[in-house]
Amino acid sequence: MDLAGICSSFQSDLDFCPDCGSVLPLPGVQDAVACTRCGFSINVRDFEGKVVKTSVVFNKLGTAMPLSMEEGPEFQGPVVDRRCSRCGHEGMAYHTRQMRSADEGQTVFYTCTNCKFQEKEDS
């Protein structure tokens, strides 16, 4: 590979664009490989003899963590000073969702950190 005539920001392997550092796509049937970010082009012949290996790794069945109530999004996030209407505990976690049309406010879901009771408020 002769990159002597190429003015580049840094020196790189053929896997990366020498101008912007992006990963270059794999060579295809075209005569050149072009960077999808900056448009830098390199002749496909420069890739001759280069070996490309790929592998796919799958997680074993059953290795994913089971979802429990404490791990859901309604139990994560900030806690505000709000009294639970069911148990009277002071302190509720909250998260927001856009449940209605985009020109209306969000819906705030409050979850009691003590009894897990959930309330909602349209803002």
Swiss-Prot record:
One record GO biological process: termination of RNA polymerase I transcription
- Residues involved in Zn(2+) 1 binding: C17, C20, C35, C38
Give the boundaries of each TFIIS-type zinc finger.
80-120
Report residues binding Zn(2+) 2: C84, C87, C112, C115
- Which GO terms label this protein's molecular function in UniProt? DNA-directed RNA polymerase activity; nucleic acid binding; zinc ion binding
Q: Where in the cell is it found?
A: Nucleus, Nucleolus
Q: Tell me the keywords, alphabetical order.
A: DNA-directed RNA polymerase, Metal-binding, Nucleus, Transcription, Zinc, Zinc-finger
Family listed? Belongs to the archaeal RpoM/eukaryotic RPA12/RPB9/RPC11 RNA polymerase family.
Any idea what job this protein has? Core component of RNA polymerase I (Pol I), a DNA-dependent RNA polymerase which synthesizes ribosomal RNA precursors using the four ribonucleoside triphosphates as substrates. Can mediate Pol I proofreading of the nascent RNA transcript. Anchors into the Pol I active site to monitor transcription fidelity and cleave mis-incorporated 5'-ribonucleotides.
Domain statement: The TFIIS-type zinc-binding beta-ribbon domain contains an acidic hairpin motif (residues Asp-103, Glu-104) that likely coordinates the nucleophilic water and magnesium to cleave the scissile phosphodiester bond and release the mis-incorporated 5'-ribonucleotides.
Q: Which PANTHER family match?
A: DNA-DIRECTED RNA POLYMERASE (PTHR11239), DNA-DIRECTED RNA POLYMERASE I SUBUNIT RPA12 (PTHR11239:SF14)
Protein's recorded name = DNA-directed RNA polymerase I subunit RPA12
